[in-house]
């Protein structure tokens, strides 16, 4: 009897130890994901739920992690606050700080991916900037929200959960920087905000989404176009600032005043958000040609939400010395031109970059 009891106790002890080791192994096998927080509506708070207005960046990264405890089932999570601002205040200084820190984090062997929380107003610009300068093929996912954290039916928690699931998915590797909101995964190069307040505001209008994500379950569609990650030629490792590039919006009866003002105030490049296929008035066209001859790089894009700005189509880019943006909208054309100007002012070389990125 004593022998049977001893054997039974031994079996219980062995099973307990086995389960403990299995749990430890499962915990150790979880992807290690770091959240870099920058503020935005996802960290925003209302004065009351009856009011539409709110203050961005009211909660820090630890608050966001605590608000979605289910993420712990997906990954081993750590968090770091980079800034805590509304994304309308995002600027070159913060971009450089974020990008340099992101590259440091991704270079660590104990980090498998990164989720970045960000305001939605400029999330597409930040995502594309990072897509150009990140030196790793590990997953990087930007998430945000259209409703503040204190709102009824806030969308931030699910967006953060889905972003964590994407970053933890091994299939995310090599897809470049991604943006995930409202159950849709977008490539940084493609995504744009299309509505001022709807949760279904982000769309990839030219090529479509990169995939879908529903309660952490991911369906991938396509690998995004363009060079990125370890294949990118751009680097901000030694950059202290980015060249000034301004966007000029074309319209009926467009004058040259804003073109002149931008150049006078130090712009090294101009992106024309042109009508139709990147066009502008005759006087604006001639002034841009003169500006291009002076060494300021001119990129033609379109103010329309989708379509391509073709080279030498309506405008003779060879004659005027312009760059055609192709698929890139004005904000992303500005980002790529800033990076290009860190390397060269040669228009043909910059056109190559627009062709490839």
Q: Where do the PLM segments sit?
A:
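Internal gly/pro-rich beta-alpha loop/helix module
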Residues: 143-214
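Short, acidic/small-residue loops that bind anionic groups at enzyme active sites
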Residues: 127-158, 164-168, 293-302
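C-terminal non-catalytic interaction/assembly regions of soluble proteins
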Residues: 277-357
């Amino acid at each position: 009897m004593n022998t049977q009891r001893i054997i039974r106790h031994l079996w219980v002890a062995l099973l307990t130890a086995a389960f403990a080791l299995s749990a430890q192994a499962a915990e150790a096998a979880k992807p290690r994901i770091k959240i870099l927080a920058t503020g935005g509506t996802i960290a925003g708070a209302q004065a009351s739920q009856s009011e539409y207005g709110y203050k961005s960046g009211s909660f820090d990264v630890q608050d966001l992690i605590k608000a979605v405890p289910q993420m712990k089932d997906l990954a081993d999570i750590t968090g770091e606050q980079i800034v805590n601002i509304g994304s309308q205040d995002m600027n070159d200084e913060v971009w450089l700080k974020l990008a340099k820190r992101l590259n440091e984090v991704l270079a660590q062997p104990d980090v498998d991916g990164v989720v970045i929380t960000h305001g939605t107003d400029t999330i597409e610009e930040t995502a594309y900037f990072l897509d150009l300068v990140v030196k790793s093929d590990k997953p990087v996912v930007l998430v945000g929200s259209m409703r503040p954290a204190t709102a009824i039916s806030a969308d931030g928690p699910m967006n953060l959960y889905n972003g964590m699931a994407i970053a933890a998915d091994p299939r995310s590797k090599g897809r470049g920087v991604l943006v995930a909101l409202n159950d849709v995964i977008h490539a940084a190069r493609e995504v744009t905000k299309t509505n001022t307040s709807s949760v279904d505001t982000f769309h990839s209008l030219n090529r479509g989404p990169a995939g879908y994500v529903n309660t952490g379950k991911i369906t991938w569609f396509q690998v995004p176009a363009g060079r990125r990650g370890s294949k990118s030629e751009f680097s901000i490792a030694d950059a202290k600032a980015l060249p000034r590039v301004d966007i000029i919006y074309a319209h009926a009866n467009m004058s040259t005043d804003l073109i002149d003002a931008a150049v006078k105030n130090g712009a090294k490049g101009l992106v024309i958000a042109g009508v139709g296929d990147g066009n502008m008035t005759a006087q604006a066209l001639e002034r841009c040609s003169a500006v291009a001859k002076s060494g300021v790089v001119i990129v033609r894009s379109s103010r329309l939400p989708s379509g391509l700005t073709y080279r030498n189509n309506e405008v003779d880019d060879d004659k005027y010395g312009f760059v055609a943006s192709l698929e890139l909208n004005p904000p992303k054309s500005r980002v790529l031109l800033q990076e290009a100007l860190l390397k060269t002012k040669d228009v043909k070389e910059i056109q190559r970059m627009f062709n490839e990125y």
